[in-house]
Structure formats: structure tokens, C-alpha cells
């Protein structure tokens, strides 16, 4: 029994060492990946708790296992907080990920082979919105809509034309790399016109929606999915919201349809994150995320870099690196070497392969969590431009790396974490 009380560093020093190095990486690099954030210690404590021991198939009050009275409290708190946060009629907090939330939503409303309209991955959509390499593109007949070549924004009239032509059973909205506001009301009107369900995947913008800084899809969509990390700043996981009339089929599709037992430690962490998101401080944080994104976009443009669609309305932006003679892959590598983490990303009408790309995606949630504001965005833009415009100049790279260290020293990340107290 003594093994129950041993510390991680004593039981598995190899894993402990890898975790220590990852903590150092997070502390010592400027995190600009739009889908990443830094959760609170409270969220980590819930996620790394003894709740991982408990099986709880089913829903609160209707479990297939005994001893669930306390995890029922946990899940009910998560559900009630999520409904309050987003003003939803019904929520299921059990999906293990955003992809599984999307799978459950599809399976609740569609049959294999049904036609679905979704945003093209290459134009900012997501793998689960119909990519042929994903289950969504294999099980359903997806027709893609995208952005215009000149504006690099969604043309809703063209979405309507596609919907009118193909008569989809469902229209999917939401994106993983679209820097502009999505008009859910307009998409609902299109869906109603052709008799389609409207599903919204708000994984990237959920935090902004919760804070009232992006129009909410909840009043318009039949079903809404999200992750709980990214801008929502919770643990990695998924959630599904829907109208009350669809509650039973959504719940049944999550379990036993696509999942077994829920991860109660993760649901506890979701509940903690939802409580944090209900605070006035969270809205202030989200406002700063948006302010920082706009500031960073403007500063990058001042540095001579081209932004897809000319800027951003949310937490992220896409930089076209072709004008500086780079690929997205090379730009990502160069920035990583001096301490700035981004991801290569396809841009609309990209001539490069998905493994190379012509762009990089940049987001502000994580740096905002560290406490950075508009002034620091100007510094970051200068660092990025210094490297991308001088890809072979090692002196410039050393200068950029020094600037990164100086900036991060002013914004320390995490004192102690639960695993290494």
C-alpha cells in the first residue's frame, strides 16, 4: 500500500523530468498558439484529483454504478454553471474532447451519407467539419464553403447559394483559423430557408462568447459544441449545448452512443473553469485578449507583414509569410528557435501542402493570461518581424532571443504546481 503515497518524482523520475522540462518551456517561451492557454492552479488541482478513481456511466441520478452521490454533485455543478455562463437550455459536459462532442452532435441529428455544409479546412474550418481524412468526411457527404479570394471573408450569399443547391440536412459553422466575426443569425436564416439544422462549433471563441465579446450562437443554433480549453481557459475537454427538445437524443448519443464512462476529474476541472468564467475578472481578461489581438495585428502590419483578411475581430490572426520569402513551416521553426511558439497554418487558396503551408496562426489568450497588454504586443510584433524579415541573420536572431527573455522575465508563469510542491 505504500505506493499510494509516493511522489511522482520518486515513482517515475523520467516522466517527472519531462514534465519539469515542459514547465520550463512554457515559462521560457512566448506562447502564441491560438488554441493554447494557461489554466489556473485550481483547475489543475481538480483535474489531477482522486476523482479519476470513480466510474460514473450515465447521468447524475441515473448512474450504472453505485457510490456516485458526490460525483453527481460535481457534474450537476458543471452543468448548472455552463448553462448560466452561456444561457443555454441544456448542456452535456461529458464529451472527452471537441472532436467527440462534434461526433456526438452529428450522430444525434444525421444518418451516414447525409449532406452537410461545412467550412473548408483550408479556409479556416476544422478537421471535423468534413475533411476527407476525418470521420466526418468519411461518414457524411460534406460540401464545403469558404472565403472570398479578395476579402478573405465568408460570403453569406454564396453560402446560401450552396445550401439552396445541395439542400443539406445540417449547416456547420465555426472555425479553427478564421479571424472575423461569424454571423450566426444570418446562417440560421439560411438554414431555415433550406430546412437544415444549424450546428455551431464555437471551440475557439467560447471565452469571447461567454464574456459577451462575440455574438452568441446559442439563440440560433440547434446544437452548439465547444472545447473547454482555448479561450475558455479550462481543462482539455468538450461540451455540447442544445435546445431542450434535443436534450434526450444528445445525452443518449454521448452515452452510450460514442463514449463510456465520463472523466469525472476532468468534469470537476470544467466546473471550476466555468465558475472562474462567471467572474467579472474573466470578462476583463477576455476584453484584454481582444484588445491585445487587435494591437498585435496592427503592429504586425506596421512591421510590413500581411495579415489574412487585413486584421482580426477575435483572439487570433493569420500571417501570410510568402511576402518575406518563407513558408509557414520555416517561419514556425525560426520563431521557435528564439523562444516564440506559433503554428504553421494554411491560408485561403494556399499553394503549399498542409505540412508546409504559407502562413502562421497567432493568438493572444496565453500571453494575456500572463498579464501582457497592448505595450507588450508591440514588443512581440517587433520580435516576430525581426526574425521573419531576417531569416538568415544570426545576430538579429540573438537580439530577438534576448528581447524574448527580457519580456518573459517581467511576466513570470506559475510559482509552484501540484505535482512538484
Curated annotation (Swiss-Prot):
Reported cofactor(s): pyridoxal 5'-phosphate
Main location: cytoplasm
Pfam family of the protein (one): SHMT
Keywords recorded for this protein, A-Z: Amino-acid biosynthesis, Cytoplasm, One-carbon metabolism, Pyridoxal phosphate, Transferase
Record's catalysed reaction(s): (6R)-5,10-methylene-5,6,7,8-tetrahydrofolate + glycine + H2O = (6S)-5,6,7,8-tetrahydrofolate + L-serine
Keyword Isomerase attached: no
UniProt binding sites for (6S)-5,6,7,8-tetrahydrofolate: 121, 125-127
Site, Plays an important role in substrate specificity: residue positions: 229
GO (cellular component) term, any one: cytosol
CDD domains (alphabetical): SHMT
Domain of life: Bacteria
Residues where N6-(pyridoxal phosphate)lysine is found: 230
Localization annotation: Cytoplasm
GO MF annotation terms: glycine hydroxymethyltransferase activity; pyridoxal phosphate binding
Pathway(s) annotated for this protein in UniProt: One-carbon metabolism; tetrahydrofolate interconversion; Amino-acid biosynthesis; glycine biosynthesis; glycine from L-serine: step 1/1
EC number in record: 2.1.2.1
One GO process term, biological-process aspect: glycine biosynthetic process from serine
Residue intervals passing through the bilayer: none
UniProt function note: Catalyzes the reversible interconversion of serine and glycine with tetrahydrofolate (THF) serving as the one-carbon carrier. This reaction serves as the major source of one-carbon groups required for the biosynthesis of purines, thymidylate, methionine, and other important biomolecules. Also exhibits THF-independent aldolase activity toward beta-hydroxyamino acids, producing glycine and aldehydes, via a retro-aldol mechanism.
Family as reported in the entry's similarity comment: Belongs to the SHMT family.
Record HAMAP family: SHMT (MF_00051)
Subunit structure: Homodimer.
Protein name: Serine hydroxymethyltransferase
